[in-house]
Amino acid sequence: GINITVIGFTNPNIKGWLSPLLWEGMTFESLVPMAQDVVDRVKAEEKSDVVIVAIHAGTGDGDGSSIESQGLDLFKSLRGVDFVVCAHDHRPVVHKTDSICLINAGSHCRNLGFGTVTLKVEDGEIVSKTLDADLLPVDKKNVDIRMQELFHSDFEAVKAFTLKEVGELKTDLRTRDAYCGMSDYVNLIHTLSLGCTPAQISFAAPLTFNGFIEAGTLVYNDLFTIYPFENQLFVVKMTGKEIKDCLEYSYDRWINTISSADEHLLKITDAPDPRTGQKRWSFVNRSYNFDSAGGLVYDVDVTKPSGKRVIIRSLADGSPFDESAEYNVAMTSYRASGGGDILREGACIDTDRIADRVVEYYPEI
């Protein structure tokens, strides 16, 4: 028979997102050239006829610049592999040559990745192999009635849970307000974070790009708009200068220096969204890395150049802020582990050794 081998790899940048508490005893390395070594070994052991490499990584640009998105790097470099299946960056795309195909179906079940291999076998030996790949759009209207019936009770149970009342909201929350200054949405996250002893300052970013929750009864499903990601909360010791440098780095990711009202304050571009293909204005960088600070009184002068925009007046209680002093800063495990590069690039903090700075952490809030 035909031997089909599937080899899976997780993302080599996991240590840049998650607390070491979640991957203790594991190490991570680039998929290039490691994946080729694994492919060669497994093919020799399994006598594989067709090889599929499935990776939790994005497509990337194929220039070796992103350890988090090495799909195209593997597509260009792997030998003896028929299909590379990737995702993570939510960008639907297919790349093909005569000897290998890359499939990224995107996100939210908008498409299905579809690969075809045609083999010609003579006297038990494969004499030719033809590959093809495509994306099949998922038609929401074309429902499998039998599956719908089989899963109806499960669907209704989940729906009932997500509509369970969990509280009251006194004011409307618009996540988009966070891009232009103080907002009730991010202030809510800051307030929760600062409620965790011994936090004095909070870093937080808008985790939903353009969400809205109306004042009134809050249901469980609304929590996914407020905070869609699973994170732990870390309280990290930082100097005042490191805090300021992180804020400078963060604001430089999402605002421009302007001199008149005719200029764009936000770093946006009028280009098709690579994840959906929709033509719209969007941020140049990811909005979930647009950190602001709670527990501080500060201004952001948008007429000043990068590195000179943030003026910290005091702590929230009016006491002086000192760049040479140390403060306890609440942030997500994603940020503390290096996510968004804010700590590492902004303040030259070695996030591989973040445990040396953690004074408290909360697995659940």
Label each PLM-derived region with a short phrase.
Residues 10-12, 56-60, 85-92, 106-108, ...:
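Catalytic metal-binding/acid-base residues of hydrolase active sites
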Residues 31-79, 94:
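Domain-core and long-helix interface of multi-subunit machines
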Residues 66-121:
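Conserved beta-sheet core of the metallophosphoesterase superfamily
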Residues 2-5, 44-51, 79-82, 99, ...:
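Loop/turn elements at helix/coil->beta-strand transitions in domains of secreted/extracellular proteins
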Residues 1-50, 124:
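Binuclear metal-dependent hydrolase catalytic cores centered on His/Asp/Glu-rich metal-binding motifs
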Residues 2-16, 52-54, 101-105, 130-133, ...:
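Active-site-proximal beta-strand elements of phosphoester/diester hydrolases
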Residues 17-30, 37, 105-365:
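Catalytic centers of hydrolytic enzymes
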Residues 52-55, 83-87, 103-104, 201-205, ...:
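General beta-strand structural signal in soluble alpha/beta enzymes
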